[in-house]
Amino acid sequence: MLKIGVIADDFTGATDIASFLVENGMPTVQINDVPTGTQPEGCDAVVISLKTRSCPAQEAIKQSLAALVWLKKQGCQQVYFKYCSTFDSTAEGNIGPVTDALMVALDTSFTVISPALPVNGRTVYQGYLFVMNHLLAESGMRHHPINPMTDSYLPRLMEAQAQGRCGVIPAQTLDEGVAATRAALSRLQQEGYRYAVLDALNERHLEIQGEVLRDVPLVTGGSGLAMGLA
């Protein structure tokens, strides 16, 4: 049975997360575009590489749901929507719309936002995304030709393009460990939040995230979270 099925919004990101999964001990196969055959033998994870980062939101949703259908046919235990660690998107999407569509299809009312990749200088603190110690909106991403990032606060970025409230699990909670992090996520869900941004300043934070999230149907983020889940 397939343990993790990754739906990646571009080829480079797909290759990135596939390498992280393999390096952390999970046999992984990367497939370009929505698969048509059966699951390759001998793998615990499949990474589906799409081209949905900057296409129209409805097309991104269509392709992502098609990938999800295939993953479900393979008995996939957990779906991982992978996007860039700089949260490349606009108020129109595509991170929010695709996340919402996957949540509906998987019948889940809550998921996480975890773009951090500390090894590459992408960290999240108090819900703010940093690139090499600079706030996202003060990095080179501010002048991105397709998806200029002029805000650094991930809950605000997510709420602008999605269908619910977004909270934050701060680094201090992650420092307290798995039980505290799990309890904090549960509280946000009970309070009606639909998404939770997870702080991460180091790999230990990602490991804790992975332990907490190992059995949930859907996670979203960059490649870093794969370290904890593999």
PLM regions: where:
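N-terminal basic/disordered segments at the start of proteins
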Residues: 2-41, 62-64, 114-119
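Anion (oxyanion) recognition and catalysis
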Residues: 22, 72, 213
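Short glycine/serine/threonine-rich phosphate/pyrophosphate-binding segments
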Residues: 13-17, 205-206, 228
